[in-house]
Amino acid sequence: MKKINKYLILIILIIITSNVFGQKFKKPQNLPRYDFQKLHFGFTLGINSLNFNVKKNSDFLANDTLLQLYSRSQKGFNLGIVSNLRLGKYTDLRFVPALVFGERYISYGFLDTISSTNQSIKRIESTLIDFPFYIKYKSERYNNFRTYVLGGFKYSYDIASKDEIDDEGKQIVKLKKHDLMGEIGFGIDFYLEFFKFSPQIKINYGILNLISNDNTLYTNSINRLSTNGWMLSFTFE
């Protein structure tokens, strides 16, 4: 919750700053009729950082073999197609199907001797097909830029999930293929001579429990496993 409050404060400051500077400096507008289009398209490229929220089972502390359990994020990249429907002067509906490549690690600390632990790190690769819908709320346009906030939900399908794969004796952490996430973000639209360029950052929180329990120590120790992360994207429309 504290992180969300920080983002909201930053968004408000950006919008206030854009209003003040926009009123002082007026320049010839690029693409003056751009925002009157009912429908337009584009593409997006970016980087991401995926991680897990790990909720341990209630009997985790009673386990005298597994002593530590935590997740670690890694950087990935994403690319997608932008479809934007104008709803009003300040609001748009956006559909941005994307292909997201990322990976995460879950680290298990097992008791090795009385005074030391042995780390077992499980690497989890994900190739996600995202289907997000956003409502975008824009500030007034000033010169050749405007700020915006957006929020929505997305369905993700992990084509790299090992949920239905026979591990043949190998102990792997299996995740379910389907996920549902909430997302919020903000960005700035820059109107260039021939197109609009938009840097944007979003944070997401998974709603579903992804752990696929196969009665191994690696999954039995986890009660709930959900996704969280952020994306920094650059959109060309």
Task: Show where each model-derived region lies.
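Bacterial Sec-dependent N-terminal signal peptides
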Residues: M1-P28, F234-E237
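Short glycine/proline- and aromatic-enriched beta-strand/turn motifs that initiate or cap beta-hairpins
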Residues: G22-K75, E237
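Predominantly the C-terminal beta-signal and adjacent terminal strand-loop region
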Residues: K27-P28, K177-G182, G187-E237
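Residues that define the transmembrane beta-barrel architecture of outer-membrane proteins
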Residues: Q37-F41, S73-F77, E125-F131, F145, ...
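Residues on the lipid-exposed face of transmembrane beta-strands in outer-membrane beta-barrel proteins
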Residues: F43-I47, L79-L85, P97-L99, F131-Y137, ...
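Repeated loop/turn-to-beta-strand initiation elements of outer-membrane beta-barrel proteins
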Residues: N51, Y90-L93, N143, F194-F197
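Flexible, solvent-exposed loop segments that connect beta-strands
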Residues: K55-Y70, E103-S126, I159-L175, I211-N223
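A glycine-rich, hydrophobic loop/mini-helix early in the fold
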Residues: G80, L85-S120
